[in-house]
Amino acid sequence: MSEDTVFTVAGQDWDDVVDAVKASSGGGGSEGGEERIVVNMGPQHPSTHGVLRLILEIEGETVTEARCGIGYLHTGIEKNLEYRTWTQGVTFVTRMDYLSPFFNETAYCLGVEKLLDITDEVPERASVIRVMLMELNRISSHLVALATGGMELGAVTAMLFGFRERELVLDVFEMITGLRMNHAYIRPGGLSQDLPEGAVEKVRELLALMPERLRDMENLLNDNRIWKGRTQGIGYLDLTGCMALGITGPMLRATGLPHDLRKSQPYCGYENYEFDVSTDTGCDAYGRYLIRVDEMKESLKIVEQCLDKLRPGPIMAEDKKIAWPADLTLGPDGLGNSPGHVREIMDSSMESLIHHFKLVTEGFRVPPGQVYVAVESPRGELGVHMVSDGGTRPFRVHFRDPSFTNLQSVAATCEGGMVADVIAAVASIDPVMGGVDR
């Protein structure tokens, strides 16, 4: 594209764009179709999953070049972690990939525990609850992927189904942690608090209802001619391309490779759970859709096993240099700390109060060293590289977010295809910009 044939248009209907190009190229002759136009899709666009900017060079209806513009949701989380204690860091990392907060928290806490060398001291009950919450979170995240992907292709019913079912999962999260998102519930050494009364029954109700709701979603889309026409063969990326770009998650498993960190590098006791790794050989958007639906079914199986494994016991490591002296719980009026918590800290001894004050304000010290820990998030390998200089704050924390890595496949999956298929290709990647920009 030469410098004299650059057309800048914004906020117009597509027909207006085409007319402007034809008018500029000499009255609508055949040469108009040969011109290449650069179009900005986003960052404010209903089909780009947040503030993602796609720079598309198109010739007619064909995409000749596709690039990503990121950084519109940069929040400086990794830098902020260097100015907070190890425990306070959980409050930040849970806000990165905001659709799968429990995975952010678990990856971070597993890294801190590895540096402290207390991985084996985390109580079994805490690990079981972590797995249960992560798998419920996988379901809620995949439901958003299917709902938004369906909406962008015109399947409004799929969007309604997806968000309706997600509400059921978020109700469970709200009951257990007090929040629908950004929980900060998982802490280094265990959990912030135990399951409330009635939580297990609430999860069992969800397990009874969800399989039927997932079948409704499958009946709606699996054999739908329009859905298959818009997704089969779209966003194609084979195993060679995935390996070259470092792609993980459903995109990689859609090539037929059963790569799942829960199986290859088990954490939180995943080796003790029975589940299958979902794969497909389509290498396209339709295959990724099938994998996400199948993964939700497998997650339900894992959650059921978690409920069977739940045994009474502590939910925090016993090391008093790490664990707070008492569980923080609300008072009977819903405000302030409970009388039991205050009594535990203040009535026992002055030393206990001093210890609690120092532990909360200054934080615990972590031995110098560095670790890399990874978990299997709904989008792929979520890794954390953590460096400690022996202080009460991290020296450096870097996250390998799967959305960031997987977005590098945009050029490979979109170039040479049609403009309309860019929407389906990006939706099948399922990027979350909070994790990309951090």
Curated annotation (Swiss-Prot):
Give its localization.
Answer: Cell membrane
Show the disulfide pairing.
none
The task this protein performs is described as:
NDH-1 shuttles electrons from NADH, via FMN and iron-sulfur (Fe-S) centers, to quinones in the respiratory chain. The immediate electron acceptor for the enzyme in this species is believed to be a menaquinone. Couples the redox reaction to proton translocation (for every two electrons transferred, four hydrogen ions are translocated across the cytoplasmic membrane), and thus conserves the redox energy in a proton gradient.
**Mode of membrane association:** Peripheral membrane protein
Keyword Transport listed? The answer is: yes
The protein's name in its UniProt record: NADH-quinone oxidoreductase subunit D
Q: Which NCBIfam families match?
A: NuoD, PRK06075.1
**Gene designation per UniProt:** nuoD
Quaternary structure, from the entry: NDH-1 is composed of 14 different subunits. Subunits NuoB, C, D, E, F, and G constitute the peripheral sector of the complex.
Extract the GO molecular function terms from the UniProt entry. Answer: NAD binding; NADH:ubiquinone reductase (non-electrogenic) activity; quinone binding
Describe the family membership recorded for this protein in Swiss-Prot or TrEMBL.
Answer: Belongs to the complex I 49 kDa subunit family.
| Assigned EC number | 7.1.1.-
